[in-house]
């Protein structure tokens, strides 16, 4: 089996594309701090469509090691050597942001798998699959308001992800009667956050939000509990994977976070638009990688496949793959994607919204005994 998968990836990397083929460059963080997220994305490549609009689709998959320099290098390779029609990636916000300037320069659409909110000249070329931080933060703040939380401590990544979550909470918090008591940061590779946690506790918050993703998000949480903090601890949707549950263990009981529908696909009401496709993806993924192996991050890549499946046929009516005209047409088509159902919700993109999610893309869960338990309204 390992040999078969390796052969497939080699074929994806080195097969010479036919002129009419559609070439998709995928930069993922399969090593480095975001590896627990990126591995499930790499495992999802085999479930992407191999033909769209009657044209063969080639996927060129590279690891960026959660590193901005490597991500930019991958993007250059995609553009200069592989002549890709679109770039998908990366897994985390920093490498995604490193790809964006190359996407703009080469006029190549980018679909980020992290909630990277491109601005200015980058905005027209960058689309994003995950839910916006603002959409997810609003759900958490609503829960805080209902539970009488007024003072919120914050400890987040010392990077764009941590910045974006702090900004979202600062902007939306006052309307919910929630005020941040401070702003502590840590690096994705840090082995200890004791000093920062002491400072957070010292501000006497009613609750704490950890602005981190994947396994590193467990570190501040377990340290808060070890140092005696008894209040609620909230997390972002970036923490919703099995490795987070495994690393945090019983200390995570009671953690509250927003998630996409696919995480609790079997508990969705039958009329939820994502239930059928989420069930399809989960059964295929876990059938290959084992029961309980589902990750919402792999599902983001699967949803990217649904989005390009809707946009590419429209672009094919205007130009041939492998040309700037096709890339421009594909960008235009992506901006007009409507009611595309994915595992994480329903996508409606426009010239002002490159995320395309609404409230159908979020739910709140509480961690109990290493499992996600839906918080009912």
State each model region's role.
Residues 4-10, 20-377:
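Extracytosolic ligand-binding ectodomains
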Residues 15-17:
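N-terminal signal peptide c-region/cleavage motif recognized by signal peptidases
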């Amino acid at each position: 089996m390992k040999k078969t998968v390796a052969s497939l990836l080699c074929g994806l990397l080195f097969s010479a594309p036919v002129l009419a083929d559609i070439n998709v460059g995928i930069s993922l963080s399969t090593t480095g701090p975001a590896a627990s997220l990126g591995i499930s994305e790499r495992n999802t490549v085999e479930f992407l469509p191999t033909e769209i609009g009657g044209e063969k689709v080639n996927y060129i998959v590279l690891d960026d090691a959660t590193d901005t320099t490597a991500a930019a290098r991958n993007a250059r390779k995609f553009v200069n050597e592989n002549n890709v029609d679109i770039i998908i990636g990366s897994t985390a916000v920093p490498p995604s942001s490193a790809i964006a300037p190359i996407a703009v320069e080469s006029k190549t659409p980018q679909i980020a798998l992290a909630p990277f909110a491109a601005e200015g000249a980058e905005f027209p070329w960058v689309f994003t699959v995950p839910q916006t931080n603002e959409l997810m933060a609003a759900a958490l703040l609503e829960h805080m308001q209902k539970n009488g939380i007024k003072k919120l401590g914050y400890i987040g990544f010392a990077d764009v992800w941590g910045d974006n979550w702090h900004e979202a909470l600062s902007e939306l918090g006052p309307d919910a009667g929630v005020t941040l008591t401070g702003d502590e940061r840590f690096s994705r590779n840090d082995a200890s956050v004791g000093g920062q946690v002491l400072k957070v506790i010292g501000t006497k918050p009613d609750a704490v939000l950890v602005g981190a993703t994947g396994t590193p998000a467990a570190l501040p949480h377990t340290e808060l509990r070890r140092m005696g903090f008894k209040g609620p601890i909230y997390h972002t949707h970036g923490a919703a994977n099995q490795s987070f549950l495994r690393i945090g263990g019983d200390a995570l009981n009671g953690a509250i976070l927003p998630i996409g529908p696919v995480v609790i696909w079997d508990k969705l009401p039958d009329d939820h638009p994502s239930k059928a496709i989420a069930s399809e993806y989960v059964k295929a993924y876990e059938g290959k990688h084992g029961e309980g192996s589902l990750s919402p991050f792999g599902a983001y890549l699967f949803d990217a496949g649904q989005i390009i499946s809707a946009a590419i046929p429209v672009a094919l009516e205007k130009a041939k793959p492998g040309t700037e005209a096709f890339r421009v047409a594909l960008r235009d088509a992506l901006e007009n994607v409507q009611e595309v159902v994915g595992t994480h919700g329903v996508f409606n993109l426009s010239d002002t919204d490159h995320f395309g999610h609404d409230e159908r893309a979020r739910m709140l869960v509480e961690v109990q005994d290493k499992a996600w338990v839906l918080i009912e309204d």
